[in-house]
Regions:
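Phosphate-group recognition and catalysis centered on beta-loop-alpha active-site segments
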Residues: 1-211
Length: 211
């Protein structure tokens, strides 16, 4: 038991080191400019979102709207425009989409480049559902020098009623630090699939919070 506690403590310290470095880079990259200031609104509560933007139709609708941030789910799957498995915009259990991640982010990037006023540009929230998609997507994001606000999200720990989390927290943070150091981190727990299951399992434990 003591050996297990020492191992968990070492993993926690290693994770905390990586996380603190990411946090420092994020703060430096933001240059004291909040998302509200970027979009020229009074507070973050005034930010308008397009959620589950996982199809070409949904993306076109979001780009023509007055939303500030476009959120989409990302996993490895099949896209009609590509002959092999690629990162696509889809929410599990779906593994097929008409919109790849590259087309998703390029469409937003190109639209932003045609706009001078940052208040009219679009930021993105990348909601990763598959750890295999993280590295290739963040590398591509860096390669095009995407310069609007980016939130990076994933459930990287087993949480309330959840199990079998496929993300490795340290690897996720390392990828963000390397390829999207100025992004805003939005991480969480993989929880149970139903409300009844969540109630049955009770609240989060202190061990989960301290991780």
């Amino acid at each position: 038991m003591a050996r297990m506690r020492r191992k968990n403590q070492e993993e926690s310290e290693d994770f905390s080191t990586v996380a603190s470095k990411v946090k420092a880079d994020v703060s430096e990259g933001c240059q004291d400019c909040s998302i509200a200031e970027y979009f020229k609104v009074k507070s973050s509560r005034d930010i308008k979102w397009s959620h589950a933007t996982n199809s070409s139709y949904a993306l076109a609708k979001a780009l023509s709207s007055k939303c500030h941030m476009i959120e989409g789910d990302i996993l490895m799957g099949v896209c009609s425009s590509y002959p092999t498995t690629v990162a696509i915009m889809a929410h599990p259990p779906n593994t097929v989409s008409d919109l790849s991640f590259e087309d998703f982010i390029l469409s937003i990037h190109n639209e932003n480049n045609s706009i001078n006023d940052t208040a009219e540009k679009k930021g993105v929230k990348l909601d990763f559902k598959d750890p295999e998609a993280v590295l290739c997507c963040l590398k591509f994001l860096k390669s095009i020098s995407f310069d609007a606000p980016v939130f990076v999200n994933a459930d990287i720990w087993d949480g309330n009623g959840g199990s079998g989390c496929t993300f490795v927290a340290k690897d996720f943070f390392s990828a963000v630090k390397s390829y999207a150091p100025n992004s805003v981190l939005s991480v969480g727990w993989k929880v149970g699939k139903t409300y009844k299951l969540l109630l049955k399992c009770g609240g989060y434990t202190w061990e989960q919070v301290e991780r």
